[in-house]
Amino acid sequence: MEIRRRPPNPKVQVAHLEYAIPHQDGEPRNILEKIVWEKDREIETARQRMPLVQLKARVAELPPALDFLGALRQAPVAPAVIAEVKKASPSKGVIREDFDPVAIAKAYAAGGASCLSVLTDRTFFQGGFDVLVAVREAVDLPLLCKDFILSPHQLYQARAAGADAALLIAAILTDQDLAYLQKVAATLGLTVLVEVHDAAEMERILTLGGFPLIGINNRDLTSFETDLATTEALTQQFADRLRAQDAFLVSESGLFARADLNRVQRSGAGAVLVGEALMRQDNVEQGLRDLIAP
């Protein structure tokens, strides 16, 4: 799958005048490409509002990041649960009308989550870095910044807002981008959760190496359909190489019941990322307890 990129504001300089020029790419071919194009525009705006030098100053004042991967490996329950703070999604619209991220995060912590995932995309998921800041102030669990990360600037934003880990999606990044962003994340103390959906993406990640935490997204980001067989197929196909790299696997999306957790755990997933199933619960804490109960 190829996700096209394009400059957010294509312009040409003629003498002392600057002219905007129209894009030649037409319309985005799927929702993921639409998100990426919008994200490029958001990044350009964010760079102007908060220059990197200011973000670096904020990050320098922070205590060390928490050990996200360590929390998953040492979880008292199996599989470990990364519980997601998410108000909406492109496929489902608003998932929770009474969205109180602080109350939800505290309920997750009380219910047995090992780590939390916080959506920071505003346009498509109604999240934000302000939500991440609020959750960081409310709980002591390791936090994942869940976004469509394309630029080092976003990694600095994530760390400055209190994230301990960041998501990198293989489908929207080149190998060069993945390697570079991994290095930037390491300098910030951020754990990288690299996400794949198919065999080609898994092959790329294992060939690059250096990604001990791999997420298998059961959701096709071009159609937003889910299938737990995705985790089963990829873990079986790449079992030997995953074992050789001591990769810790997270199964993401489409997980609604304990039977689903058992299914992906049998395939080799050491953790699951669960959002919608919990966000739709009247009692989020009890919903999580019921989900992880053996």
UniProtKB/Swiss-Prot annotation:
Pathway(s) it belongs to: Amino-acid biosynthesis; L-tryptophan biosynthesis; L-tryptophan from chorismate: step 4/5
Keywords: Amino-acid biosynthesis, Aromatic amino acid biosynthesis, Decarboxylase, Lyase, Tryptophan biosynthesis
EC number: 4.1.1.48
GO biological process, one term: L-tryptophan biosynthetic process
InterPro entries in the record: Aldolase_TIM, Indole-3-glycerol_P_synth, Indole-3-glycerol_P_synth_dom, Indole-3-GlycerolPSynthase_CS, RibuloseP-bd_barrel
Molecular function GO terms recorded: indole-3-glycerol-phosphate synthase activity; phosphoribosylanthranilate isomerase activity
Gene3D superfamilies in the cross-refs: Aldolase class I
Keyword Transit peptide annotated: no
Lyase recorded as keyword: yes
Top EC class of this enzyme: lyase
SUPFAM superfamilies per UniProt: Ribulose-phoshate binding barrel
Known catalytic reactions: 1-(2-carboxyphenylamino)-1-deoxy-D-ribulose 5-phosphate + H(+) = (1S,2R)-1-C-(indol-3-yl)glycerol 3-phosphate + CO2 + H2O
Similarity field: Belongs to the TrpC family.
PANTHER family linked: INDOLE-3-GLYCEROL-PHOSPHATE SYNTHASE (PTHR22854:SF2), TRYPTOPHAN BIOSYNTHESIS PROTEIN (PTHR22854)
Protein name as it appears in the record: Indole-3-glycerol phosphate synthase
Provenance organism: Synechococcus sp. (strain WH7803)
